[in-house]
Swiss-Prot record:
PANTHER family per UniProt: RIBOSOMAL PROTEIN S9 (PTHR21569), SMALL RIBOSOMAL SUBUNIT PROTEIN US9M (PTHR21569:SF1)
Protein name: Small ribosomal subunit protein uS9
Listed GO biological process terms: translation
Gene it is expressed from: rpsI
Residue span of region Disordered: 1-45
Entries under Gene3D superfamilies matching the protein: 3.30.230.10
Keywords: Ribonucleoprotein, Ribosomal protein
Pfam families with a match to the protein in the record: Ribosomal_S9
Organism: Nocardioides sp. (strain ATCC BAA-499 / JS614)
Top-level taxon: Bacteria
InterPro entries the UniProt entry points to: Ribosomal_Su5_D2-typ_SF, Ribosomal_uS9, Ribosomal_uS9_bac/plastid, Ribosomal_uS9_CS, Ribsml_uS5_D2-typ_fold_subgr
The UniProt record lists the keyword Transmembrane: no
Biased composition, class Acidic residues, residue ranges: 1-16
GO cellular component: cytoplasm; small ribosomal subunit
Length: 166
């Protein structure tokens, strides 16, 4: 049996500081703009009382939220659309598997937290390509609106008891 693999030897030269470099030419202009191998990215998103820890792994677009599929965790199509928005904005649908752990808050808050976490993770994957579109769509901004506290002497945060002039 003969081994028919073609091996290409790369030649490296050493400069006066002892740093090795290649004398080969730069990559061609038609090289892909996005990196071929993408490392997994982690990020955290928060919304109201909800916190989502997100991990993006190169894959086929599978979602795992607290050990369940996206459809079973968020049965409402609106929440699914909110969560998927960063992928639609960056045109990367189906390129990453999402593994998320969410706790606290309600369903809408959790969907918002997951959206922010996914957007931050996509930003971490490729800042130059993804950040402008995510920033323009407002997906990298934390929504700071939270429940206003109840004040003493009032029925709710702002609702006062009925006032009688006489």
């Amino acid at each position: 049996m003969s081994d028919t693999t073609n091996e290409v030897e790369e030649t490296y030269e050493v400069d006066e500081q002892g740093i090795a470099y290649s004398s080969e030419s730069a990559p061609s202009a038609d090289a892909p703009l996005r990196p071929a191998t993408i490392a997994p990215a982690n990020a955290t998103g928060r919304r109201k009382e909800a916190v989502a820890r997100v991990r993006l792994v190169p894959g086929t677009g599978e979602w795992t939220v607290n050990g369940r599929t996206l459809d079973s965790y968020f049965p409402n199509k609106l929440h699914q659309q909110v969560v998927n928005e960063p992928f639609v904005t960056t045109q990367l649908e189906g390129r990453f598997d999402v593994i998320a752990r969410i706790h606290g808050g309600g369903i809408t808050g959790q969907a918002g937290a997951l959206r922010l976490g996914v957007a931050r993770a996509l930003n971490a994957v490729d800042v130059e390509a993804n950040r402008p579109s995510l920033k323009k769509a407002g997906l990298l901004t934390r929504d700071a609106r939270v429940i206003e506290r109840k004040k003493a002497g009032l029925k709710k945060a702002r609702k006062a008891p009925q006032f009688s002039k006489r």
